[in-house]
């Protein structure tokens, strides 16, 4: 889950959504889970959050298709959620309800593999009190969670899809990683050789039924170690041989 922050001044809430990527600040709104799975045919899926801070928080939520800079009203996605805007008081919770309603132009998603979108949650702190003064720094915090749309009838088990990855050394000093499954495989980290001496990548999302590449350092590595994140945010270590 990625988090963004920026200075909040007189600008409207919409301008705050154009936050640039920066180190994470401490968020009052705590979201349950690190990713969202929408199973095709389900009437809805939900995302829960709670305000663990000391002050009310204004929350705005929307879904994008991967363009983090797009404004909510500029994005066309086959989902809608409610509520898109809410006040969450300290110690209270809020549930986002996400519904699949298809594209307005009738475009369909692939039925043989997962599709990925992003859930955005923007947290805006309350205005500074007179006691705090007008010079106080206020930060908006934007969290982005992957939202996977999972069609019915996909083969295999999404919880063990990472075990099916294959690795091949190509003549040009590149490691080819192939994901033969219909699921996205999310790697927390991949290392080639001891402690990544021959190459590493952190993090890495491998699209279904496709291949990606990593430039290698040297030619001596015989295996890779990688750590995969499952639907529930758990991390499982794997090791696999590199084919020549």
Swiss-Prot record:
Cross-referenced Gene3D superfamilies: Immunoglobulins
Any Gene Ontology biological process: chaperone-mediated protein folding
One of the Pfam families matching this protein, by short name: PapD_N
Signal peptide region: 1-24
Keyword Signal appears in the UniProt entry: yes
InterPro entries noted in UniProt: Ig-like_fold, PapD-like_sf, Periplasmic_pilus_chap, Pili_assmbl_chap_C_dom_sf, Pili_assmbl_chaperone_bac, Pili_assmbl_chaperone_C, Pili_assmbl_chaperone_CS, Pili_assmbl_chaperone_N
Key words, A-Z: Chaperone, Fimbrium biogenesis, Immunoglobulin domain, Periplasm, Signal
Main localization of the protein described in the UniProt heading: periplasm
Localization (cell): Periplasm
Keyword Ribosomal protein attached: no
One GO location term (cellular component): outer membrane-bounded periplasmic space
Similarity section: Belongs to the periplasmic pilus chaperone family.
Role summary: Required for the biogenesis of the filamentous hemagglutinin and the fimbria.
Protein name per the record: Chaperone protein FimB/FhaD
Gene name, Swiss-Prot/TrEMBL: fimB
């Amino acid at each position: 889950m990625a988090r963004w922050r920026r200075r909040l001044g007189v600008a409207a809430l919409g301008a705050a959504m154009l936050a640039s990527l920066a180190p994470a600040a401490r968020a009052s709104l705590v979201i349950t889970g690190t990713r969202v799975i929408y199973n095709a045919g389900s009437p809805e899926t939900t995302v829960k959050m709670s305000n663990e801070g000391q002050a009310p928080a204004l929350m705005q939520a929307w879904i994008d298709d991967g363009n983090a800079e797009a404004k909510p009203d500029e994005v066309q996605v086959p989902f809608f959620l409610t509520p898109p805007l809410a006040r969450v008081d300290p110690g209270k919770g809020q549930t986002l309800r996400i519904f699949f309603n298809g594209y307005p132009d009738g475009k369909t998603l692939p039925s043989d593999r997962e599709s990925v979108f992003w859930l955005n949650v923007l947290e805006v702190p309350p205005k500074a009190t007179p006691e705090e003064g007008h010079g106080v720094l206020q930060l908006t915090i934007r969290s982005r969670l992957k939202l996977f749309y999972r069609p019915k009838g996909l083969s295999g088990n999404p919880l063990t899809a990472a075990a099916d990855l294959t690795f091949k050394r190509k003549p040009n000093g590149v490691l080819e990683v192939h994901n033969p499954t219909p699921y996205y495989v999310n790697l927390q980290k991949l290392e080639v050789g001891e402690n990544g001496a021959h190459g590493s990548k952190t993090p890495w999302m491998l699209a279904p039924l496709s291949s990606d590449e990593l430039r290698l350092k040297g030619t001596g590595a015989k295996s890779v170690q990688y750590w995969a994140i499952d639907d529930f945010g758990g991390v499982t270590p794997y090791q696999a041989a590199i084919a020549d």
